[in-house]
Amino acid sequence: MEKTLLNEFEKYEEIRNDEFEIIDCENLSPTIATLLICNDGLRLDNLKTIRKIEPEKVTTFENELLHGLEIPKNNKNVINFIVHELRNNIYEHSQFKRGLVMGKSYPDFKDISFIDNGINIANSLKNANYAIKNDCDAILKAINGLSTKNELGFVERGTGLNNTINIVVNGCYGSVLIGSGKGLVFLTKDNIYMKTIDETPVNGTLISLRMHLSEKVDIYKYLNPLKL
């Protein structure tokens, strides 16, 4: 039975509590590997599928990521859109010093994880004077379009994350896992699961995606607000 992205996060928690007893790094999922490297400072140098996101906005990782995932030609625009949106989110909101992206192909799906060590979603919104109940509430508000982006004196509605989730869960029959601070939110087409992660908080923000890309996905069908 296929492990979900939520199962992968729970596996990370087990590994972390076992003092990083890792035997085969190449078998780690993107969710686990990016967390261990960026969140916990573990060196996993033999992972060829991981790429750095540099604060200076170097974008060479994108082509390398896409090439390694072997995305079908008719769905390359899906991955291009998602990578562009999530990369921009990191640059515009996180104030990060270290970021990573990792993709991995499985027989029936593709997994991609983005992580940064920035200020996390709740702190980003608090810095903009938004009222936040907790870290899960902050994640949901960000998904629903609450944004800290301000240009020419106007606060913009943030649609990139919302569109990305809509494409993944409805267009690609996939799922999304977002961990930020002490909040964890797992989304599928039919369900939203949330929990507080006091013992294993994410120092910045993790966004993991699982996508089924065997059939062509028309991203323009999903560029509409997805209200959670």
Question: Where is each model-derived feature located?
Answer:
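Flexible, glycine-/charge-rich segments associated with ATP-binding catalytic modules
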Residues: M1-E14, L44, K48-K52, N129-K133, ...
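Amphipathic alpha-helical interaction surfaces in cytosolic regulatory modules
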Residues: M1-R43
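Conserved ATP-binding N-box helix of the HATPase_c
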Residues: Y12, K73-Y106, N162-I165, N170
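Intrinsically disordered, low-complexity linker/loop segments enriched in Gly/Pro
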Residues: R51-N74
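Short beta-strand element(s) in the Bergerat
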Residues: D108-I112, T205
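Acidic ATP/Mg2+-coordinating residue in the GHKL
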Residues: D116
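A short glycine-centered beta->alpha linker in the GHKL/HATPase_c
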Residues: N120-A131, D135
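ATPase catalytic-site recognition across NTP-hydrolyzing enzymes
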Residues: D137-L140
